[in-house]
Amino acid sequence: MSTQELNIRPDFDREIVDIVDYVMNYEITSKVAYDTAHYCLLDTLGCGLEALEYPACKKLLGPIVPGTVVPNGARVPGTQFQLDPVQAAFNIGAMIRWLDFNDTWLAAEWGHPSDNLGGILATADWLSRNAVAAGKAPLTMKQVLSGMIKAHEIQGCIALENAFNRVGLDHVLLVKVASTAVVAEMLGLTRDEILNAVSLAWVDGQSLRTYRHAPNTGTRKSWAAGDATSRAVRLALMAKTGEMGYPSALTAKTWGFYDVSFKGETFRFQRPYGSYVMENVLFKISFPAEFHSQTAVEAAMTLYEQMQAAGKTAADIEKVTIRTHEACLRIIDKKGPLNNPADRDHCIQYMVAVPLLFGRLTAADYEDEVAQDKRIDALREKIVCYEDPAFTADYHDPEKRAIGNAITVEFTDGSRFGEVVVEYPIGHARRRADGIPKLIEKFKINLARQFPTRQQQRILDVSLDRARLEQMPVNEYLDLYVI
């Protein structure tokens, strides 16, 4: 039997073509999308500024080789670094994701679409500084917002129906694909060059979820998105040189992504690319917690207040029952020792125990100093979770996109509180009116972590005036964030 393969170069896979046509041709007309992108930008930058408080993050920042000087390099907010766009994308992306406090998208695949801002902002700033140096017009922040909307859409629409987690792949592969497409367009590549760039992103071997799950949970989950968005910038720059692409990167028999990495299945799509994802993205506003636990933490805070009013403490608790959805059980229902902050912020029992004990949940609560309190593990042992199929159905319903959790607390004296149910977290599109004022407050708090009062005010004066922000050159806006 012949094993010869027919060596006829195919057309580009339809999935790749659709991404490229969208990023090149789609005109964003949604006011809601731009409104949301504005707040998303501020929130994402603020998350990065907070991460600078943590040495484990800061040690990864800066140039690859100390002392490297890049003329007209991209700024890294909250630092003095000015780097090549690839390394700047890694720096910004790692900062953004470090504390698990930036936005979230929940579907068949999970992810954090604002991770793409690493590549988008680094490239836009680098292009702007070089344009100004050459006497040309820089990019504006409106172009950054447009790029964010499109990157959100690419990552989120693919995620709606396609569970990369089911085959052990990490969602940052979608950051790489989305960032590659948007950055390539921003760089001014031709259609053929962008097709090549996106195909290169799919051909890459993709990150495994190993570092997100027991027994190997670790800090790579905090820099994996920075790695992906920086790789995207590199691939786009390679394509700009004329580097070839691989038309059937997805569909090639035996050697394509589908056969190698997706068990021979092909992607399914719920809707065409538009602006749906940015309009419906979830913000983490109140708690730096894995998003499937956000409503559980909110419920636990309510229960803490009820215990205070009743004169009870966590020491009086006999049992805690969490009624939840399937994705929560699969990702963050965790028993046994928790070895590091990355372990703890992906354990629903930990994230519920802390507010029941202390009436709070902050990024510092995942650190060893707090985690060594033996009362936390003792309370974790009393917390049990089970799936409510109705919560799971509402989680997958595109018209609801609920992330429901309900908690019941029983006490050693035989009494119990009524179940506290929270279906939509405060960062959900259905609670924007509640959430946006708190999001702005979160941004102000994060600015205050790094900048003196007058500099904070200069940043706020521009950032909270969207019309002024949109017209501002990218390089001038990022100059506001230099320490």
Curated annotation (Swiss-Prot):
InterPro entries (alphabetical): 2Me_IsoCit_deHydtase_PrpD (IPR012705), MmgE/PrpD_sf (IPR036148), MmgE/PrpD_sf_1 (IPR042183), MmgE/PrpD_sf_2 (IPR042188), MmgE_PrpD (IPR005656), MmgE_PrpD_C (IPR045337), MmgE_PrpD_N (IPR045336)
GO biological process, one term: propionate catabolic process, 2-methylcitrate cycle
UniProt GO molecular function: 2 iron, 2 sulfur cluster binding; 2-methylcitrate dehydratase activity; aconitate hydratase activity
Annotated Gene3D superfamilies: 2-methylcitrate dehydratase PrpD
Annotated pathway: Organic acid metabolism; propanoate degradation; Carbohydrate metabolism; tricarboxylic acid cycle; isocitrate from oxaloacetate: step 2/2
Summary of subunit composition and partner proteins: Monomer.
The protein's role, per its UniProt record: Involved in the catabolism of short chain fatty acids (SCFA) via the 2-methylcitrate cycle I (propionate degradation route). Catalyzes the dehydration of 2-methylcitrate (2-MC) to yield the cis isomer of 2-methyl-aconitate. It is also able to catalyze the dehydration of citrate at a lower rate, and the hydration of cis-aconitate. It has no aconitase-like activity and is unable to catalyze the hydration of 2-methyl-cis-aconitate.
Protein name in the entry: 2-methylcitrate dehydratase
Species assigned in the record: Salmonella typhimurium (strain LT2 / SGSC1412 / ATCC 700720)
Gene: prpD
